[in-house]
């Protein structure tokens, strides 16, 4: 019975890539810098203290993959762990360092074209675009029109939004158009309708995602995003390994978290909603228990990126990693004879790095299975090696990019 479980620790980079200079990210290292700050006592909070402790990830080869990427061991990680999995560090072939590019490449389809971007920090959006969106939505104005941190923009504009009913439009260094609205005063359904209008009006701009950012709270300092985020992505430019499994093998692909949104529902047969790392983990365990032959269970743990990476919260990121690590044996205990588990990431988001954007880094590729030989798989030239490996494993037609590493 063929089953594969892909767990994406969103933003968990393990050291800058050779092309990081083009992105302003030379020296970035999400894992290494978190470990450094933990070792120095600079990442203590109510949940954790001291050196970074990731014994189970280290057994799967995380410490070794990081060393092969950066030339050094991350302090606190067990460099003498008995390795039980295959491990690698992978570079990105895609032109960007964004979520769709990383995920599509993982599934065998790198993004070799250039996304459209809203590069101006202020007055970011063309007036003709926003005029069309507002007219179709029956709105008389909007707030923002800038690059912004998703949490800061709520403090800056949330109260005015509640008072005026004007949505908050903002963007970032990624190919995104983001809309933040209060779930209670503006309405969630209305926000999602507005995002659909924006998605349609952005057809000629080559923007990767429109993101609905609903929030709640009475006022500044008390606003909080909810779990009802939606990502409206464009479709991948060609068939991913997910689509091939479904179409060629009549297989199942179970999306947990925002996976379905990222792939614009292409190649997704089942969607499980869960928010927050504990709930995402529980949903993953439940779906592994239920999974039959020719099934991929695919989970994105977005909080590593959204709650800790972008917010530059080193202690929070470290605590979340340690929580994930402690629960990892629960996944391993459910593995059957022919199963494959792949732990990976889609880009970096170094919480010690200037700004709030992603970082261009290698991703870990940690592979475990009872029939997987432990040891180094070296440096992989593209995330698409994961997709090609899955294509070979499930017996679908091969992908155009990537090499099978098993």
Curated annotation (Swiss-Prot):
Keyword Ribosomal protein: no
Protein name, UniProt field: Phosphopentomutase
Function field: Isomerase that catalyzes the conversion of deoxy-ribose 1-phosphate (dRib-1-P) and ribose 1-phosphate (Rib-1-P) to deoxy-ribose 5-phosphate (dRib-5-P) and ribose 5-phosphate (Rib-5-P), respectively.
UniProt keyword list: Cytoplasm, Isomerase, Manganese, Metal-binding
Co-factor requirement: Mn(2+)
Cofactor binding notes: Binds 2 manganese ions.
Catalytic activity: 2-deoxy-alpha-D-ribose 1-phosphate = 2-deoxy-D-ribose 5-phosphate; alpha-D-ribose 1-phosphate = D-ribose 5-phosphate
One matching Pfam family: Metalloenzyme
Pathways per UniProt: Carbohydrate degradation; 2-deoxy-D-ribose 1-phosphate degradation; D-glyceraldehyde 3-phosphate and acetaldehyde from 2-deoxy-alpha-D-ribose 1-phosphate: step 1/2
Residues annotated as binding Mn(2+) 1: 10, 346-347
Chief location bin: cytoplasm
Homology family: Belongs to the phosphopentomutase family.
Record SUPFAM superfamilies: Alkaline phosphatase-like (SSF53649), DeoB insert domain-like (SSF143856)
Compartments, as annotated in UniProt: Cytoplasm
Organism this protein belongs to: Vibrio cholerae serotype O1 (strain ATCC 39541 / Classical Ogawa 395 / O395)
Binding site for Mn(2+) 2: 305, 310, 358
InterPro entries: Alkaline_phosphatase_core_sf, DeoB, Metalloenzyme, Phosphopentomutase_DeoB_cap_sf
EC number(s) stated in the UniProt entry for this protein: 5.4.2.7
A GO CC term attached to the entry: cytosol
A biological process term (GO) from this entry: nucleotide metabolic process
GO MF annotations in UniProt: magnesium ion binding; manganese ion binding; phosphopentomutase activity
